[in-house]
């Protein structure tokens, strides 16, 4: 399947469902090395099949090891050079984050990573990239909004209207992304933005 078509860049965003390279057995993600190997093989195969120039991930382990592993797999499996955005953090239990892997043959980072910590920290970020062939710059915002699981109260309660629980939190997160866009676009010096992620928003969402 040709997903690129006539476009010069292909961007992919994916929830990796707790991609952990350590801190196993917490009830989230793999319980051991064998399970991680299976997850890694499936994820890496899927990413190589897509063969995007830029990947945004959510539910990938904090720290740099998980991103480095997938960048190395993409380089090996596609014959192109991939790198990742190092946010300077370290692994902290089974906590996950939003992260970036990009083809350094095609793109280069423009400016530093920007954080939006409305809600859970490390799950909403923006990074600008420059396309080497054209010099064009764009912002890529990767986000993971609050899920519908659990019981909420107040504006987070399930109102029975199809939005499920924690709609209030998701609305606040969505507004925060829009609010951060102004300062992010000023910082990067460019207004073109691509917003992607697991927003946990379905047809009935506000």
Where in the sequence are the language-model features?
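Divalent cation-coordinating acidic motifs and surrounding scaffolds
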Residues: 1-206
């Amino acid at each position: 399947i040709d997903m690129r078509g006539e476009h010069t860049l292909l961007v992919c965003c994916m929830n990796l469902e707790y991609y952990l390279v350590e801190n196993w057995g917490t009830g989230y993600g793999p319980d051991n090395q064998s399970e991680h190997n299976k997850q890694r093989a499936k994820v890496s195969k899927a990413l190589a099949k897509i063969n995007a120039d830029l990947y945004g991930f959510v539910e990938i382990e904090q720290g740099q090891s998980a991103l480095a592993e997938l960048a190395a797999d993409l380089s090996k499996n596609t014959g192109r050079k991939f790198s990742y955005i190092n946010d300077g953090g370290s692994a902290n239990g089974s906590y996950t984050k939003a992260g970036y892997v990009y083809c350094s043959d095609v793109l280069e980072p423009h400016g530093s990573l920007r954080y939006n910590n409305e809600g859970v920290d490390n799950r909403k970020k923006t990074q600008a990239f420059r396309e080497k062939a054209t010099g064009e710059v764009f912002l890529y915002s990767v986000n993971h909004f609050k899920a519908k699981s659990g019981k909420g109260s107040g504006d987070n309660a399930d109102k029975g209207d199809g939005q499920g629980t924690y709609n209030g939190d998701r609305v606040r997160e969505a507004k925060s992304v829009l609010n951060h866009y102004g300062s992010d676009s000023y910082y990067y010096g460019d207004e073109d933005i691509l917003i992607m992620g697991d927003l946990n928003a379905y047809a009935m969402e506000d």
